[in-house]
Amino acid sequence: MPTEAHVGDLDGSASSQGGTWKATVTVTVHTSSHSPVAGATVTGSWSIGGTASCTSDSSGRCAVATSAISGGTRSTTFTVTGLTHATMTYKPAANHDPDGDSNGTSIVVRKP
């Protein structure tokens, strides 16, 4: 049974909402053998201020989102600050992102 978990992907998206916009980041958590991890709580912070957390589902994914961001703000960065699980320990040095849009720990989301 695996004992370590890490972030295996961060994907960002943005949506316009009138004069504001919203950033969403989908986090994928998996084991060293790339099996999805359900029940992991991921915590992080936004560069525009504020924190967010989510709990991974059976596919190892969960999403965090900002509230409305001013139209004058061109981007925000989400940085993973922690990951907890009932039976696994977090190994942040193993964080990665296969598509290269992040380093597995932080991702920039740009205004649409």
Predicted regions and their residues:
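Glycine-centered loop-to-beta-strand initiation motif
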Residues: S56-S70
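Enriched for extracellular/lumenal, surface-exposed ectodomains of secreted and cell-surface proteins
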Residues: F78-P98
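Short glycine/proline/serine/threonine-rich loop/turn segments at secondary-structure transition edges
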Residues: S70-T77
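Short strand-edge motifs at loop-to-beta-strand transitions and within beta-strands
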Residues: A52, C62-V64, T105
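Beta-strand-rich domain onsets/edges
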Residues: M1-T24, H30-T31, V108-P112
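Short beta-strand elements
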Residues: P92-P112
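Short, ordered, surface-exposed loop/turn motifs in non-cytosolic proteins
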Residues: A23, H34-W46
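Short amphipathic beta-strand segments in non-cytosolic proteins
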Residues: T28, T41-S53
